[in-house]
Amino acid sequence: ETVLRRERAAGKRVSCVYVVPNFQNPTGTLIGADKRLGLLELAARHNLLIIEDDPYGELYFDERDAHITRPIKADDREGRVIYLSSFSKTLAPGFRVAWLAAPAALASKLDVAKQAADLCTGSLDQRVVYESWKRGLLTERVPQLRAHYRDKKNAMERVTRSELGDLATWREPRGGFFLWVALPVHLNAETLLARAVREKVVYV
């Protein structure tokens, strides 16, 4: 809200808020339930739209955590949320097929904008996604992906802990692809990058 007031005071027109609520890239941040409702209240007070981008919401690691990724859109009573998601994280990265849920008036305008950008998404990709959905392949695949990425997360934490010890801190992610590691203030990330390049180590 402070940022919003500052931007408007500077004469800038703010009409929407863009948010990735679940396991955001690159920090893996998960927005809590109270803050999600707070965003809806903020949008109502200031007449804003919320663009909710949720490509990772299905990729929580523990079935008991399914509720933590509840879309903001699920509590939208005023038609303020445009919900976006993608099949590229749950089916295959090569299928750049996404979808949205929005009030009809907005959806029709977004449809026109999509056509102006690239006419339409490839028909073959759309057909593969449709058949996968219809045959229940996604229902089978998503739990497998959760287990796969949970195992990769656990392996990454083990290696980070063994190699960096107390030099690194992080909050254990509850889903998604990302593990955000914080280094002590006396370590310079740019210096480490140069060393990583010399050692031919991938550095993000």
What is each residue range found by the language model?
Residues E1-V204:
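PLP-dependent class I/II
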